[in-house]
Swiss-Prot record:
<dbReference type="GO" id="GO:0010445">
    <property type="term" value="C:nuclear dicing body"/>
</dbReference>
<protein>
    <recommendedName>
        <fullName>Double-stranded RNA-binding protein 1</fullName>
    </recommendedName>
</protein>
<dbReference type="GO" id="GO:0009737">
    <property type="term" value="P:response to abscisic acid"/>
</dbReference>
<dbReference type="InterPro" id="IPR014720">
    <property type="entry name" value="dsRBD_dom"/>
</dbReference>
<feature type="domain" description="DRBM 2">
    <location>
        <begin position="101"/>
        <end position="170"/>
    </location>
</feature>
<comment type="subunit">
    <text>Homodimer. Heterodimer with DRB2, DRB4 or DRB5. Interacts with SE and DCL1. Interacts with RCF3, RS40 and RS41.</text>
</comment>
<dbReference type="GO" id="GO:0035198">
    <property type="term" value="F:miRNA binding"/>
</dbReference>
<dbReference type="GO" id="GO:0010267">
    <property type="term" value="P:ta-siRNA processing"/>
</dbReference>
<feature type="region of interest" description="6 X 28 AA repeats of E-K-I-E-T-T-P-N-L-E-[PS]-[PS]-S-C-M-[NS]-G-L-K-E-A-A-F-G-S-V-E-T">
    <location>
        <begin position="247"/>
        <end position="414"/>
    </location>
</feature>
<dbReference type="GO" id="GO:0005634">
    <property type="term" value="C:nucleus"/>
</dbReference>
<dbReference type="GO" id="GO:0035279">
    <property type="term" value="P:miRNA-mediated gene silencing by mRNA destabilization"/>
</dbReference>
<dbReference type="GO" id="GO:0031054">
    <property type="term" value="P:pre-miRNA processing"/>
</dbReference>
<keyword id="KW-0694">RNA-binding</keyword>
<keyword id="KW-0943">RNA-mediated gene silencing</keyword>
<feature type="short sequence motif" description="Bipartite nuclear localization">
    <location>
        <begin position="207"/>
        <end position="222"/>
    </location>
</feature>
<dbReference type="Pfam" id="PF00035">
    <property type="entry name" value="dsrm"/>
</dbReference>
<comment type="function">
    <text>Double-stranded RNA-binding protein involved in RNA-mediated post-transcriptional gene silencing (PTGS). Functions in the microRNAs (miRNAs) biogenesis by assisting DICER-LIKE 1 (DCL1) in the accurate processing from primary miRNAs (pri-miRNAs) to miRNAs in the nucleus. Forms a complex with SERRATE (SE) and DCL1 to promote accurate processing of pri-miRNAs by DCL1. Binds and assist DCL1 for accurate processing of precursor miRNAs (pre-miRNA).</text>
</comment>
Length: 419
């Protein structure tokens, strides 16, 4: 620690302004007024202060680097001038370190010098035949200072603080001798920035922090599976596939009729439940394969088909079916007057199997008479019950086959016919 640092630290701690304020209040004088004069450039300014008390001006020493020190110097000069009179010599001439402010000054000095707070340690001293006394030791800046023995602990701490201040001031005797004065606050040289010793700085290497956001799935890239079991087949679109559940299909009148393969299917597996199909008048009649189906498997339940007058009559295969299997229950078919009469195969059926129950057929006057095969049937099997047929007057007479039947089998009972 240099002498200039010590002198500047101690001079800034003194409270000459406070003592001058107390003096003005004691003698009912106006409050001291301070004026500051700034000299030099802005980067290296010098301050000088002047205090006015009771109309008298007191100038400080020149060359201070701050205003506070300049004002303290002006207050000290004022107190020195006032101490020359005999009345004020007692209260003014007493040094600052002789008063109780030395502890405060020492603490301010430690703060300005970046020292630790002064630590006071008091000890009790006992001597035979004398009053008990106390001694105190203060530590500041790593140096311990011990004061004189006193009767109380408070006085012992003040004595230790005064000892420390006097020791610090003793280092600045040379500076005080140069000015040949007893002033405490003196200007000092400004501190120069010394070349700092390069220190090895340990720079910590920053570690890369992991990203906290979730990784997005990379689209368009496929990973190759090591095991064939791990392969995941994505679902394929089903736009081109047929729906398993059959839907109701509404057909237009231009659709073609059922294929003949439907007849083969029913002929092979017997009765098959089929859906009711409403057809338009332009559709063709059922295929001839339906007759073969009934001839092979006997009675088959079929759906009722409503046909228009333009449809053709049943195929000749129906006669073969009845001739082979005997009585067959058939559906009632309502025909229009334009339909042709029953085929000649019906006569062969009755001739082969005898009496056969047939449905009553109402015909119009334009129908042709029964075929000649009816006569052959009666000639072969004798009396045969036939249905009553109402004919119109325009119908032709019985065929020549009726005569042949009576000649072969004798008298035959026939139903009365109305001509």
């Amino acid at each position: 620690m240099t002498s200039t640092d010590v002198s500047s630290g101690v001079s800034n701690c003194y409270v000459f302004k406070s003592r001058l304020q107390e003096y003005a209040q004691k003698y009912k004088l106006p409050t001291p007024v301070y004026e500051i004069v700034k000299e030099g450039p802005s980067h290296k300014s010098l301050f000088q202060s002047t205090v006015i008390l009771d109309g008298v001006r007191y100038n400080s020493l020149p060359g201070f680097f701050n205003r506070k020190a300049a004002e303290q110097s002006a207050a000290e000069v004022a107190l020195r001038e006032l101490a020359k009179s005999s009345e004020l010599s007692q209260c003014v001439s007493q040094p600052v370190h002789e008063t109780g402010l030395c502890k405060n000054l020492l603490q301010e000095y430690a703060q300005k010098m970046n020292y630790a707070i002064p630590l006071y340690q008091c000890q009790k001293v006992e001597t035979l035949g004398r009053v008990t006394q106390f001694t105190c030791t203060v530590e500041i800046g790593g140096i311990k200072y011990t004061g004189a023995a006193t009767r109380t602990k408070k006085d012992a701490e003040i004595s230790a603080g005064r000892t420390a201040l006097l020791a610090i001031q003793s280092d600045t005797k040379n500076n005080l001798a140069n000015y040949n004065t007893q002033l405490t606050v003196l200007p000092c040289e400004k501190k120069t920035i010394q070349a700092a010793i390069p220190l090895k700085e340990t720079v910590k290497t920053l570690k890369a922090r992991k990203a906290q956001f979730k990784k997005k799935a990379q689209k368009g890239k496929r990973t190759v599976a090591k095991n064939p079991e791990d392969i995941i087949i994505p679902p394929q679109p089903t736009d081109h596939c047929q729906n398993d559940q059959s839907e109701k299909i509404e057909t237009t009148p231009n659709l073609e009729p059922s294929s003949c393969m439907n007849g083969l299917k029913e002929a092979a597996f017997g009765s098959v439940e089929t859906e009711k199909i409403e057809t338009t008048p332009n559709l063709e009649p059922p295929s001839c394969m339906n007759g073969l189906k009934e001839a092979a498997f006997g009675s088959v339940e079929t759906e009722k088909i409503e046909t228009t007058p333009n449809l053709e009559p049943p195929s000749c295969m129906n006669g073969l079916k009845e001739a082979a299997f005997g009585s067959v229950e058939t559906e009632k078919i309502e025909t229009t007057p334009n339909l042709e009469p029953s085929s000649c195969m019906n006569g062969l059926k009755e001739a082969a199997f005898g009496s056969v129950e047939t449905e009553k057929i109402e015909t119009t006057p334009n129908l042709e008479p029964p075929s000649c095969m009816n006569g052959l049937k009666e000639a072969a099997f004798g009396s045969v019950e036939t249905e009553k047929i109402e004919t119109t007057p325009n119908l032709e007479s019985s065929s020549c086959m009726s005569g042949l039947k009576e000649a072969a089998f004798g008298s035959v009972e026939t139903e009365a016919s109305h001509a």
